[in-house]
């Protein structure tokens, strides 16, 4: 019998990863805005993602819709436990989206919209990190009902992961701008990105050390045999790709810094999945316990398998059409 729950969790996991990468670098551009005061530089930065930024968020919608369709218990429980940070994240996304469009229309109030774009980008990343940290720490449930407090999500660890996601997005943004720009803006990114990579490596290390120490079940999953043998390449590869990303910046490579950062994101995400598997509401509810009826999963899976190739095609097409570098004075992006 086909395990529809496993198929759905793979779809959702891949969708979330694509969202983190695609929306990560365009959120990173807003996070990097304070490093640049000139309007021309900021225009170029925004133009690198103007044709694709709203499409990038499609993957967040796909992940949320997938949870609702295939794992309704997760949707209701996680939403109840993380209601406030999710709402604040959505508000920040709205501010950022409005600022993105209004900044080019209202020259008189451009400074205000710049600040809204910066604030919306930083807060979106921060609250996504808060949600991640709270999820890793676990969600208190009894018979499928959330039984924790309204502020259980707010802990030093979740704040730290919030900062970590902001740094992650800024690093992706640096890599994207190195690839998509040239001249002075690109040179500045070569200076900023190594600092971001080092900060990101430190954050990855702290989270990797804290998580197994605070959660014995996660430590057992990583450090018992044969898992230890299978998973030991993950931290080694993190070291390797961190070094290669730093070297690529020093050698002024254009695509490599972004690709090595992408590899670090995939490795960190892999570690996250390994730590929690098979629990979808950590630390007690597995994907099979939280699953919708098979008939519901099958019906929605058919729709997803029809829709996902279309999303992939138009996403790939938009990136292909706007594949060239963006320079000062380029028009047609708005």
Positions of predicted regions on the chain:
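N-terminal signal-anchor module of multipass membrane proteins
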Residues: 1-55, 61-64
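Helix-coil boundary and interhelical linker segments in multi-pass alpha-helical membrane proteins
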Residues: 1-12, 66-83, 136-156
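Extramembrane terminal tails and long inter-domain/linker segments of multi-pass membrane proteins
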Residues: 2-5, 32-33, 37-50, 287-289, ...
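Alpha-helical transmembrane segments
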Residues: 8-19, 79-91, 118-123, 152-166, ...
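Membrane-interface helix-loop-helix modules in multi-pass inner-membrane proteins
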Residues: 52-122, 142, 220-229
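Long, contiguous internal "core" modules enriched in hydrophobic/ aromatic residues
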Residues: 102-253
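Central hydrophobic cores of alpha-helical transmembrane segments
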Residues: 258-266
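Short, membrane-exposed interhelical loops at transmembrane-helix boundaries
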Residues: 281-300
